[in-house]
């Protein structure tokens, strides 16, 4: 909205509508929730991140700090008998998955590699079943978080942009938003434990907010197509 105002558009009477992902056809939404050997599955979303978009020279140190925090969190998950399913949002994130696994091995020495699931996702159609197979999602990419919510998954968002914080707030999950620029493994673990503990209470809230967003988009489509 601020950008539109800046280039001369009048936006005072314009309504802001939810992301179009909320209107995904029901046929695309899988309803699968499998546990690996009875263990709970955590969808862990990774992304290439080297600092705020406004920073002219991205920092490798910033990226490594982000990655090392994820590795420490993953080490805690493995120590507490969780299965980790890596999630990506762009093709370029596959290199992050590889580096993550390398750092995890360096950190832990040996671990049960069957408890780290890393499958390619080259499309939304491939990504959706991967998210559906998780019990809880901890993710960085906006659309990993958004798709998890559409699938009614309790989420911790590692927020790299104000749009992530806004989404979590709109979904009633503001307390489960973790600022990527101030990552703290201990606090991330606490947020994860809280979201897991409250998962059954959160799911109806998420479902209701998603349905509200879907109805808002229906309204938007009606307004658009009536004017054509």
Protein language model regions, located:
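Active-site anion-handling motifs in enzyme catalytic cores
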Residues: 1-228
């Amino acid at each position: 909205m601020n950008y539109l105002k800046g280039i001369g558009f009048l936006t005072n009477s314009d309504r802001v509508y939810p992301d179009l992902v909320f209107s995904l056809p029901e046929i695309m939404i899988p309803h699968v929730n499998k546990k690996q050997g009875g263990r709970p599955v955590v969808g862990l979303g990774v992304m290439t991140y080297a600092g705020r978009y406004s920073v002219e020279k991205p920092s490798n140190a910033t990226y490594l700090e982000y990655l090392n925090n994820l590795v420490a969190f993953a080490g805690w998950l493995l120590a507490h008998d969780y299965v980790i399913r890596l999630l990506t949002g762009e093709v370029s994130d596959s290199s992050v998955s590889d580096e993550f696994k390398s750092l995890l091995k360096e950190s832990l020495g040996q671990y049960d590699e069957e408890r780290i699931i890393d499958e390619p996702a080259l499309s939304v159609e491939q990504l959706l079943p991967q998210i559906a197979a998780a019990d809880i999602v901890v993710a960085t990419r906006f659309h990993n978080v958004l798709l998890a919510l559409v699938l009614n998954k309790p989420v911790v968002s590692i927020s790299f942009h104000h749009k992530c914080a806004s989404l979590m707030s709109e979904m009633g999950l503001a307390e489960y938003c973790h600022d990527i620029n101030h990552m703290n493994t201990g606090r991330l673990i606490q947020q994860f434990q809280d979201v897991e503990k409250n998962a059954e209470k959160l799911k109806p809230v998420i479902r209701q907010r998603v349905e509200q967003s879907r109805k808002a988009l229906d309204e938007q489509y009606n307004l658009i197509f009536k004017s054509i």
